[in-house]
A protein has these predicted regions:
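Active-site-adjacent loop and "lid" segments of alpha/beta metabolic enzymes
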Residues: 1-31, 35, 51-137
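Short strand-loop junctions, especially beta-strand C-caps/beta-turns
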Residues: 47-49
Length: 137
């Protein structure tokens, strides 16, 4: 996230969001470890939706597997985010289940180990189907 929560959506700029965020998170992991935090206790969140444009968010998702290079679990949270509404018909947050599931499954395919979701049962069902699809002969 660039800036503060009040200003994070005001013209965010990245040269290439996935690489810029990777470098930032790499520095933060190093700082955490220097402060005594064991690497196995760290997970990262590339911040989908926080101080990002729709284009930035799509870049992050399409390049999510890059973050495996950090050597820590990836948390991905796009459930009900405004990006879904901007890509579709402008639905309110409580009507973004389909988009939330689509983004979660894309993150799962890229190897995200942790998904932050609102609709747990629906996501579990979608993950079961996605897992079967990925592992079918």
């Amino acid at each position: 996230m660039q800036g503060q929560p009040e200003t994070m959506q005001d013209e965010p700029h990245y040269d290439f969001a996935p690489v810029d965020i990777y470098q930032f998170l790499e520095e933060r992991i190093e700082a955490a470890m220097a402060a005594g935090i064991v690497k196995s206790h760290i997970a990262i969140d590339p911040g989908f939706g926080f101080g990002k444009t729709v284009a930035h968010n799509l870049q992050i998702l399409n390049w999510l597997s890059l973050f495996h290079g950090l050597g820590v679990p990836i948390l991905f949270g796009a459930s009900r985010k405004s990006t879904i509404a901007k890509l579709s018909k402008g639905e309110p947050a409580d009507q973004r289940l389909a988009g939330s599931l689509a983004l979660a499954m894309a993150a799962y395919r890229q190897g995200a180990q942790i998904l932050r979701v609102h609709d747990v049962a629906e996501t579990v069902q979608a993950l079961a189907v996605e897992h079967a699809l990925l592992h079918a002969g």
